[in-house]
Design a protein with these regions (language model features):
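Ferredoxin-type iron-sulfur electron-transfer modules and their immediate structural context
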Residues: 2-152, 159-244, 248-369, 421, ...
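Residues within alpha-helical segments
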Residues: 3-6, 10, 442, 465, ...
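Alpha-helix capping and helix-loop boundary segments enriched in small/acidic/polar residues
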Residues: 96-99, 135, 146-153, 207, ...
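Short conserved micro-motifs at the rims of enzyme active sites and ligand-binding pockets
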Residues: 158, 257-258, 488-490, 556-558
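Glycine-rich ThDP/TPP pyrophosphate-binding loop and its adjacent helix/strand module
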Residues: 351, 365-371, 380-396, 401-527
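Conserved active-site loop/cleft motifs that coordinate metal ions or position small ligands
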Residues: 476-478, 545-547, 556-557
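Glycine/tryptophan-enriched, flexible segments
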Residues: 533, 549, 553-559, 565
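Short acidic DE-rich linear segments
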Residues: 582-583
Length: 583
């Protein structure tokens, strides 16, 4: 078929008549759209740099254009101005079939589909043609699903997971050209205020509730159907307003900040993830350094707050604010509110110490320190640093997007690659089993460890992430992430389905090890259906290609792969017994 396609390219040439007048046409240049709406820093960056670079005219920029960015930083949220319009088909919402589950938003790799909760007044001001429903569980509110067609990549993950009603989905895929005029509906949705009572009703750390929080990772350049970005996006919805991210070089750094476009953004208060990238293998140490720097600054501020609280000149209001901040010093969930109260109480006071505290208010609240990277970094070239950070005992979170291969560099084998998988440096199928990074981390006894696979268990994913962040020590999350390098025969629109199959067949296991919990180890996966194991392997080109090239070797390695999966699950069930019998 491939040869026939090549031959058709030569024999199927069609002559296109070009008008004679084109010979004398003048070059009118590109039609640049001048951006005016948004934060001044990002608007200036988009107009002066991003637009030119995206048009491949970056070489024409003078050095003076970069004077505001000499420290290497760039404004958050510039990806929202690209509006690439690259999808062939985009999701269309049929409100009659919607059960308001928010699954579509939860799995969207690019944050282009979002639920909106509107008051009656907001709904009355909605653009013409905006469909909406009475909101379930929230009388007086209207509910809508909004879609940014111009930012969509057309992967279809949302439509794939949509449960719909009576076999009829609420989301179907249709031609982009027929829905480009609906962009104002999405744009309106971004102006609607975030409803604290709605988030409180459905809870921010649940599948449904989390999606009423603005994603602070939006419109990245990740592949259509990417398995990594849904995890990162969810983390920003849970903790993005107080996040620091150290990002290892790899896919997550490329979709995380491909110059000049920055998909990490801010909320209505101007708060969002502070992101940086370490070029080499020292990302864990890099993130650890961020944490130590924060701790040093906050410890100094803590001493000054204690001095203010102990002062005889301090009012009762000031003392109460200081006490609340000190009491919540180590709680990320509570310290932010206490910080706002402290700053409000100290502002305007003519006191050098108070002025110093207010001047450094950005450092007062406890931050959520994350270290992002892929398996090539965490299992291989950066493993020493990962181990060092986990051993430190410090309150820090490591998120590993586990694609079981070096994704960004083209699919090289890593220590996460499983037996029989074909990858660069393992063209004949990898002969050795996957490194058990989770067990290595659990051996410390004081590290929170979780394995998650979003498509297999939406609730377990958000629960594990919330538990890891709340745990007052090091945490490690290994997230199964389907990748284009896997060659999923069903296509990347079925990435969430593949995550589900991986767990159902025992290829991947979901579990949580929480040293702070009474029940330390929880195996969240049911007993696998091993009958479908070989079909799962053959459903991905990384395995199926070996079966085509060398069936005998494939049969041997695939059998070994399956045996290792059985052994792995049996080991996990023993951990359930071991920790379940603790006094």
């Amino acid at each position: 078929k491939n040869w026939a396609a090549i031959d058709a390219g030569a024999t199927g040439v069609v002559k296109v008549e070009v008008p004679e007048s084109w010979k004398n046409c003048e070059d009118e240049g590109l039609d640049y759209k001048v951006v005016t709406d948004g934060r001044k820093d990002v608007v200036d960056f988009v107009n002066n740099i991003q637009t030119k670079v995206s048009a491949q005219e970056g070489n024409s920029l003078p050095v003076s254009a970069f004077k505001d960015y000499v420290d290497g930083s760039t404004p958050s949220g510039s990806a929202a101005y690209e509006k690439r319009g690259i999808a062939v088909n985009v999701p269309v919402w049929n409100s009659d079939n919607c059960i308001q589950c928010n699954f579509c938003s939860y799995v969207c790799p690019h944050a282009v589909i979002r639920p909106v909760a509107m008051t009656a007044e907001e709904a009355a001001n909605a653009p013409a043609g905006m469909k909406m429903l009475d909101m379930t569980g929230m009388p007086g509110y209207k509910f809508a699903i909004t879609i940014s067609a111009l930012d969509c990549t057309g992967c279809g993950s949302c439509a794939n997971v949509c449960p719909g009603k009576k076999g009829e989905k609420a989301l179907t895929m249709d031609k982009l050209a027929d829905h480009m005029d609906e962009q104002p509906i999405f744009d309106f949705g971004t102006t609607v205020s975030e409803k604290e009572d709605v988030v409180a009703k459905f809870k921010a750390n649940t599948v449904k509730g989390s999606q009423f929080k603005k994603p602070l990772l939006e419109f990245s350049g990740a592949c259509a159907g990417c398995g990594e970005t849904p995890y990162a996006k969810l983390i920003t919805q849970l903790f993005g307003d107080r996040m620091y991210i150290a990002n290892a070089t790899g896919c997550s750094s490329i979709w995380g900040n491909s110059s000049p476009s920055t998909p990490y953004t801010v909320n209505a208060k101007g708060q969002g993830p502070a992101w940086d990238n370490s070029l080499f293998e020292d990302n864990a140490e890099f993130g650890y350094g961020m944490l130590l720097a924060q701790n040093a600054i906050r410890d100094e501020l803590k001493e000054k707050v204690e001095n203010v609280a102990a002062s005889e000149e301090a009012s009762e209001e000031v003392k109460a604010a200081c006490a609340e901040w000190l009491d919540t010093f180590g709680s990320g969930a509570l310290n932010g509110v206490a910080t706002d109260k402290l700053v409000a109480a100290l502002e305007g006071i003519d006191c050098p110490t108070c002025k110093y505290i207010v001047a450094n208010k950005a450092f007062l609240a406890k931050k959520s320190q994350w270290i992002f990277g892929g398996d090539g970094w965490a299992y291989d070239i950066g493993f020493g640093g990962v181990d060092h950070v986990l051993a430190s005992g410090k309150d820090i979170n490591i998120m590993v997007f586990d694609t079981e291969v070096y994704s960004n560099t083209g699919g090289q084998s890593s220590k996460s690659t499983k037996t029989g998988a074909v990858a660069q440096f393992a063209a004949g199928g990898k002969e050795t089993k996957k490194k058990d990074l989770a067990s290595i981390a659990m051996s410390y006894g004081y590290v929170y460890v979780a394995q998650i696979s979003m498509g297999a268990d939406y609730a377990q994913t958000v629960k594990a992430i919330a538990e890891a962040e709340a745990y007052p020590g090091p945490s490690l999350i290994l997230a199964y992430a389907p990748c284009i390098n896997h060659g999923i025969k069903k296509g990347m629109s079925k990435a969430q389905t593949e995550e589900k199959l991986a767990v159902e067949t025992g290829y991947w296991n979901n579990f949580r090890f929480n040293p702070a919990a009474e029940k330390k180890f929880t195996l969240d996966s049911k007993a696998p259906n091993m009958e479908g194991y070989q079909d799962f392997l053959k459903g991905e080109v990384r395995y199926a290609s070996l079966a085509m090239k060398n069936p005998e070797r494939a049969a041997k390695l695939f059998a070994k792969n399956e045996a290792e999966a059985k052994e792995r699950y049996e080991y996990l069930t023993k951990l359930v017994t071991l920790y379940g019998n603790e006094e």
